């Protein structure tokens, strides 16, 4: 009799965890859709290569860090790309580049899963997510290289070329990771302060 009760408790705990993961997946997808709408409807025209990744990566990564869905960044990134494509914008370089948005999301999900598994916090969290953002956005740069149009030229302050593009993608990727990490770090610090 006692064995059957412990089995029921394990099943109930497992179903609760699954329900929570599903709810957080829906949150990540919703954040991805809102990010995609922002990118599609608000044309910033910054002219900086890789700047759109900042506007989808940061909110989706914050939702993943706060929500805990294991595939939240991947799902949010894909839905951001699908939303922008549906509204005529060009986040993922069209249908050809969408799988690489998923790869960028997988890099971020793997990194966050590693951070959660090893209880990494503090400034090391900020540093790791900054580098993960760089890696994810450089995957997006490789996406631009496989498109039929190739690397269209960008000229800002008389600077152009591959190295400028590489630095710009790295900057916006690291900025997204760092801002997401700091926002979560500030939230944790605020909760610790309120509990004491």
Regions found by a protein language model. Give the residues of each.
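Interfacial aromatic-anchored transmembrane helix boundaries in multi-pass membrane proteins
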Residues: 37-49, 80-110
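Hydrophobic alpha-helical transmembrane segments
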Residues: 25-29, 58, 70-78, 95-99, ...
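Hydrophobic transmembrane alpha-helices
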Residues: 3-67, 71
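Short helix-perturbing small/polar motifs within transmembrane alpha-helices
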Residues: 2-16, 24-31, 37, 98-142, ...
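Juxtamembrane/transmembrane-helix boundary motifs in multi-pass membrane proteins
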Residues: 15, 19, 23, 48, ...
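Alpha-helical transmembrane segments of integral membrane proteins, especially early/N-terminal helices
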Residues: 53-63, 93-95, 130-135
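Membrane-helix interface "capping/anchor" motifs
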Residues: 63-76, 115-120
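Membrane-embedded alpha-helical hairpins and interfacial helices in multi-pass inner-membrane proteins
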Residues: 118-196
């Amino acid at each position: 009799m006692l064995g059957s009760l412990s089995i029921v408790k394990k099943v109930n705990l497992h179903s609760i965890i699954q329900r929570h993961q599903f709810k957080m997946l829906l949150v990540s997808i919703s954040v991805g859709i809102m990010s995609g709408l922002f990118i599609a409807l608000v044309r910033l025209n910054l002219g900086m290569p890789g700047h759109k990744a900042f506007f989808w990566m940061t909110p989706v990564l914050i939702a993943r860090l706060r929500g805990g869905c294991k595939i939240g960044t991947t799902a949010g990134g894909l839905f951001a790309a699908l939303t922008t494509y549906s509204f005529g914008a060009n986040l993922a370089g069209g249908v050809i580049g969408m799988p690489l948005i998923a790869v960028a999301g997988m890099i971020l999900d793997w990194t966050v899963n590693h951070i959660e598994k090893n209880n990494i916090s503090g400034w090391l969290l900020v540093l790791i997510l900054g580098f993960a953002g760089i890696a994810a956005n450089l995957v997006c740069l490789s996406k631009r290289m496989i498109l039929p149009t190739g690397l269209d030229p960008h000229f800002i302050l008389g600077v152009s070329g591959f190295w400028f593009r590489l630095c710009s993608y790295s900057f916006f990727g690291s900025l997204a990771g760092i801002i997401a990490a700091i926002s979560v770090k500030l939230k944790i610090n605020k909760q610790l302060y309120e509990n004491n």
